[in-house]
Amino acid sequence: VTSPAHAPAAAGPRTSWRRRWVLFNLLMALFALIWVTVHNIFWGTPPPPDQEPGLFPERFSAAERLADQFSYFTVWSATLVALAMALILVRPGTRSRVIRVLHLTSLVMITITGLVYWTMLAATSTDLLSVGNLSLHLFTPVVTLLTWLVAGPAGWLELRLLPGILVVPALWLVFTFVRGAILGVYPYGFINLVRVELGEVVRFVAQVLGVAVVLGAAYCLIDRVLPGRARARAGRIIRAVTERTPVGRRTTE
């Protein structure tokens, strides 16, 4: 009999198929980050027409273009996903509060990345179907959510972790607005204080932070109520695809 302290629902992805799923999530995020880094920094390509003015000028050095790249919320989100997946792989059975907060933060931030892009930015994007764009704004968000739903870690998320998910977005906001005040450049038009009134920017930021808290709470509740059998069934389907075992067969985990 498995004791509650060692129940599979509360543990990290120890089984091979779960680890492969988490590893795929990690590689997806890393691929997206490496692709856009090479494209934006080392190729030195001119910015697309829909780029905010002042970002990625051809005369900038690689270090300056790297700073431009990390002004994007999207890049912070994908970086956090990669970090969270790496920590889950290295410490699958941990109950570290810091790692659980990072995992929840990555889920929330990458979800917001996808939602904001596809509802507010995609319509005017000039590189909608590019490899880097789809990797960052579609594949990484979808794979990250599927990984959590199917492979876990399950039972990690709690409502008391919610205050912690605002730390990284707050750091991004401080970096973005301090840098914008100094250089006069911003990553997104809707927070560009050169063209948008402060009150509108504050309202938008407050709304996004509110959505972040709601998403975080929703993920905590889903993690609490999602039946273990549903995850186990999903796991058997994944194993049937990846290991070619019959879906109905129960394998030892």
Residues of each region from the PLM?
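Perimembrane loop-to-helix junctions flanking transmembrane segments
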Residues: P47-L66
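Membrane-interface transmembrane-helix boundary segments in multi-pass integral membrane proteins
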Residues: P13-R19, D68-S71, L183-Y219, G248-R249, ...
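Interfacial segments of alpha-helical transmembrane regions
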Residues: R95-M109, E158-L166
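Membrane-interface loop-to-helix entry segments
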Residues: F73-V75, L129-V142, V205-A206
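Non-cytosolic membrane-interface motifs at loop->transmembrane helix junctions
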Residues: I99-L102, S125-H137, R160-L161, I191-R195
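Juxtamembrane "helix-exit" motif on the non-cytosolic side of transmembrane helices
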Residues: Y117-T126
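Alpha-helical transmembrane segments in multipass membrane proteins, preferentially the mid-helix core
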Residues: P141-L157
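Alpha-helical transmembrane segments of multi-pass membrane proteins
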Residues: L27-D50
